[in-house]
UniProtKB/Swiss-Prot annotation:
The gene is tadA. It catalyses: adenosine(34) in tRNA + H2O + H(+) = inosine(34) in tRNA + NH4(+). This is tRNA-specific adenosine deaminase. The keyword Transferase does not apply. GO terms for biological process: tRNA wobble adenosine to inosine editing. One of its GO terms (molecular function) is tRNA-specific adenosine-34 deaminase activity. Binds 1 zinc ion per subunit.
């Protein structure tokens, strides 16, 4: 029986499921899954608020798991699927871990370090280059984030309204 090769879309849907776990924990809904030889070796979702850890981004969580599974910090030939373009911190971790590719959904104009704001992954001064595939399920990934922030703004507005009515 031959091994099934899963598509970028398949793995991005898995990352979106993880992003929804972040939403359920009231974290910014970003999910990441790390794949090596068609097998999940790490996964994560944003958890900086709950963990009181500014580095607990989805990508970092997945890379940490991958290192433990592979018993090596070098994750050569691994592919990281993430619902949002990585930030500078996460892009740096990808370079240090030596992953081969990052596949992301939505671009991040404010903090994206894989081409939107800057391109850390292809910077000529870096000792490793990470291939980039972007736009996989981009609209769905962006909609999840937009819906989350819309909900948060509505909650804040309702809290302010409730507070002003008690004053």
């Amino acid at each position: 029986m031959s091994e099934v090769e899963f598509s970028h879309e398949y793995w991005m849907r898995h990352a979106m499921t993880l992003a929804k776990r972040a939403w359920d924990e009231r974290e910014v809904p970003v999910g990441a899954v790390l794949v090596h030889n068609n097998r999940v070796i790490g996964e994560g979702w944003n958890r900086p608020i709950g963990r009181h850890d500014p580095t607990a981004h989805a990508e970092i969580m997945a890379l940490r798991q991958g290192g433990l599974v592979m018993q090596n910090y070098r994750l050569i030939d691994a592919t990281l699927y993430v619902t949002l373009e990585p930030c500078v911190m996460c892009a740096g971790a990808m370079i240090h871990s030596r992953i081969g590719r990052v596949v992301f959904g939505a671009r991040d104009a404010k903090t994206g370090a894989a081409g939107s704001l800057m391109d850390v992954l292809h910077h000529p001064g870096m000792n490793h280059r990470v291939e980039i595939t972007e736009g996989i399920l981009a609209d769905e990934c962006a909609a999840l984030l937009s819906d989350f922030f819309r909900m948060r703004r509505q909650e804040i507005k309702a809290q302010k309204k409730a507070q002003s009515s008690t004053d």
